[in-house]
């Protein structure tokens, strides 16, 4: 006997229903996380490369590590400025894709490479010519200036290829393809480690080069990164469609806009990096132990900061695409989703660091005097992770939206005019020491985040009003 069973009509209909489509908020959230993940890995790779140099050189010789650190300090200013000045490549590429004009991205890339050439070779010349004089003028002791001069010159030689690698990485990120850049950054880290192990202690034949060997390892790794990225871009199947091989017509407004975005980002980077570096001076007025403790806090914060940097780049791409597509609602949605996500991530980092602060501090030092300063400073640092993360993401979102100078002015006010004087007042006259420096960073981070979020909201209101008037 055959038994025929039938499914109820409602159940059958339910079983055949297609998957519910995602709403725009969930779609943007998934896209943000997809873009941010590889970018975070890429930015972490930059930090690991510098950390590798320091570890290998430090194990070889503490004296050589001092030379390496002094040579790296002035070169890092040029590196940071270069990254900021070339942000326009990422933003303009995303805008072209959002406008449905992928061929224009090739013109953005070519302009970026020319600009990178000028920046790279100009920075190399300035650093090589004036860097040694700067070291001598600082009145450094124990032969630091003399020992750091040659590594500094070698570091300067890698600035042109580094600028090229930044352009290629930003261009791929603007195309919403951050994965290759992240993968190649970590391959460059492998090259850097191998070159360090070969050149610094002088194994397998070459003489031990110490700090100079670490600088040459950085040169080799940066060159390998630039070459790998260039080969990848040239061999992309879409390269011709994207205009990579086509000489673009001269477009002065686009050239100016691309550089203008970079000017604002470069100035912001300068203000922020200089302000945080300037805290070392105030800590030096407190005590040598305060300098060491602040260095630990800054190092931990810098590692955590790579996540907001990655989310900021992803946000710039998404807001830039919406800007190119003339989609104000898309810009608003992408921005506020990113602000919420990074705010939560910042809070989570603080909640994670607070109970583990002892282990983190012990990874750096076991000195009781240093630990007495590091532990409360790490507790205070937990309070600025969220606002600091929000401000960097909001600044990038505003630049992608066409607001170039508001973030720069905000960073000038917050970091140059508020943080430094407040840190000095709290640390020295008020007697709060290192904790006063950390409190000033907390206040400044909330101030910058508040300014930038308010400006983003003002643009939301402006665009909504314009849409209502047009209707």
From Swiss-Prot:
InterPro entries per the UniProt record, alphabetical: MATE_fam, MATE_MdtK, MdtK-like
Claim: Cell inner membrane is one of the keywords in the record: yes
Pfam families: MatE
CDD domains: MATE_NorM_like
Subcellular location: Cell inner membrane
Keywords: Antiport, Cell inner membrane, Cell membrane, Ion transport, Membrane, Transmembrane, Transmembrane helix, Transport
Disulfide bonds: none
Membrane spanning stretches: 38-58, 69-89, 114-134, 152-172, 197-217, 266-286, 289-309, 334-354, 370-390, 409-429, 434-454
GO CC annotations on file: plasma membrane
Chain's role: Multidrug efflux pump.
Record family assignment: Belongs to the multi antimicrobial extrusion (MATE) (TC 2.A.66.1) family.
Protein name per UniProt: Probable multidrug resistance protein NorM
Organism: Caulobacter vibrioides (strain ATCC 19089 / CIP 103742 / CB 15)
């Amino acid at each position: 006997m055959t038994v025929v069973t039938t499914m109820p009509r409602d159940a059958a209909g339910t079983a055949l229903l297609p998957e519910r489509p995602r709403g725009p908020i969930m779609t943007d959230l998934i896209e943000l996380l997809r873009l941010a993940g590889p970018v975070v890995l890429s930015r972490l790779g930059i930090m690991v490369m510098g950390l590798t140099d320091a570890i290998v050189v430090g194990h070889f010789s503490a004296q050589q590590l001092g030379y390496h650190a002094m040579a790296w300090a002035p070169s890092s200013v040029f590196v940071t400025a270069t990254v900021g000045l070339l942000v326009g490549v990422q933003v303009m590429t995303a805008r072209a894709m959002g406008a449905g004009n992928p061929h224009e991205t090739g013109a953005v890339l070519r302009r970026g490479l020319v600009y990178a050439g000028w920046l790279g070779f100009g920075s190399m010349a300035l650093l090589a010519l004036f860097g040694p004089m700067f070291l001598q003028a600082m009145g450094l002791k124990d032969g630091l200036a003399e020992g750091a001069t040659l590594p500094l010159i070698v570091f300067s030689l890698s600035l042109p290829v580094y600028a090229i690698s930044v352009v290629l990485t930003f261009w791929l990120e603007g195309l919403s393809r951050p994965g290759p850049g992240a993968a190649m950054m970590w391959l460059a880290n492998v090259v850097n480690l191998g070159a360090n192990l070969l050149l610094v202690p002088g194994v397998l034949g070459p003489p031990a080069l110490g700090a100079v060997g670490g600088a040459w390892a950085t040169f080799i790794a940066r060159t390998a990164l630039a070459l790998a990225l260039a080969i990848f871009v040239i061999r992309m199947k879409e390269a011709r469609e994207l205009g990579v091989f086509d000489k673009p017509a001269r477009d002065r407004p686009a050239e100016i806009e691309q550089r203008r975005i970079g000017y604002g980002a470069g100035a912001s980077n300068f203000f922020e990096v200089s302000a945080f570096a300037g805290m070392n001076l105030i800590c030096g007025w407190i005590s040598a132990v305060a300098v060491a403790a602040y260095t630990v806090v800054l190092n931990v914060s810098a590692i955590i900061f790579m996540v907001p940097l990655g989310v900021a780049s992803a946000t710039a791409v998404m807001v830039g695409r919406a800007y190119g597509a003339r989609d104000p609602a898309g810009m608003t949605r992408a921005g506020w989703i990113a602000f919420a996500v990074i705010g939560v991530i910042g809070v989570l980092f603080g909640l994670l660091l607070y109970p583990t602060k002892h282990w983190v501090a012990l990874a750096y030092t076991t000195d009781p005097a240093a630990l007495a300063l590091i532990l409360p400073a790490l507790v205070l640092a937990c309070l600025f992770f969220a606002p600091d993360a929000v401000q960097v993401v909001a600044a990038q979102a505003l630049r992608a939206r066409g607001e170039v100078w508001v973030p720069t002015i905000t960073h000038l006010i917050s970091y140059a005019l508020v943080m430094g004087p407040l840190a000095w007042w709290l640390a020295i006259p008020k007697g709060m020491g290192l904790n006063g420096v950390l409190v000033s960073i907390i206040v400044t981070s909330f101030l910058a985040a508040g300014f930038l979020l308010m400006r983003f909201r003002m643009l939301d209101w402006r665009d909504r009003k314009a849409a209502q008037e047009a209707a």
